[in-house]
């Protein structure tokens, strides 16, 4: 495998960050975050401690679901200007139920290199530690927070034969367990893994 100098000008990096243990940040991710020109963070306050510990020098910008429309053109302009851009989420891989998906698609369309710096992912960490079948699985991300769309999605998931992984906010977890339809006769709940 050929290795290139990183960060490369005009390249977008999707960088996996720890989901509970700072030791999970790879040496490659650490070096890249120290060197990129721009770091787009889901929450600059949350990521600030990690980036300060790394002595990351890049300009930090917030990049989340509420400002994607305005930040996307700014980040694309940075790439067009030849700057290296890293995207990080609060925990795990950006683009997996976190910001990054739309930016990666736009960067591909504009023919900018898009490089994933692998790291922890809560979905796969929970799956492999659950003891449930993991050879084939379905990932649902976050469910709608309420209403008919949420009920409809739960009914669709109930028909799924593969192990299903979904995300839920901690304050809604007990409600989710109460909402699971009676048709979940095959439901197996692993021990909930703290992250």
What are these regions (language model features)?
Residues 159-183:
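Conserved anion/nucleotide-ligand pocket segment
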Residues 19-20, 90-94, 170-172:
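Short glycine-rich anion-binding loops that position phosphate/pyrophosphate groups of nucleotides
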Residues 75-114, 121:
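Glycine/small-residue-rich loop that forms an oxyanion/phosphate-binding "nest" at active or ligand-binding sites
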Residues 1-65:
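Glycine-rich, flexible N-terminal cofactor/catalytic loop recognition
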Residues 102-160:
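Class I SAM-dependent methyltransferase SAM-binding "motif I" and its flanking Rossmann-like core
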Residues 33-39, 112-115, 163-164:
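Short active-site oxyanion
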Residues 185-191:
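Conserved small/polar residues in nucleotide/adenosyl-binding loops
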């Amino acid at each position: 495998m050929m290795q290139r100098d990183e960060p490369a000008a005009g390249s977008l990096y999707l960088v996996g960050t720890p989901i509970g243990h700072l030791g999970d940040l790879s040496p490659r991710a650490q070096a890249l975050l120290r060197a990129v020109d721009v770091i787009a963070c889901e929450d600059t306050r949350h990521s600030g401690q990690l980036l300060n510990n790394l002595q990351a020098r890049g300009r930090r910008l917030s990049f989340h679901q509420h400002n994607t429309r305005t930040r996307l053109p700014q980040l694309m302009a940075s790439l067009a200007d030849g700057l290296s851009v890293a995207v990080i989420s609060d925990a795990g891989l950006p683009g997996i139920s976190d910001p990054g998906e739309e930016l990666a698609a736009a960067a591909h369309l504009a023919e900018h290199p898009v490089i994933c710096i692998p790291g922890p992912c809560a979905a796969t960490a929970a799956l492999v530690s659950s003891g449930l079948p993991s050879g084939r699985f379905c990932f649902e991300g976050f469910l709608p927070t309420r209403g008919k769309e949420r009920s409809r999605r739960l009914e669709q998931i109930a028909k799924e034969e593969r192990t299903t992984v979904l995300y839920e906010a901690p304050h809604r977890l007990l409600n989710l367990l109460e909402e699971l339809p009676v048709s979940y006769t095959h439901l197996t709940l692993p021990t909930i893994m703290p992250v």
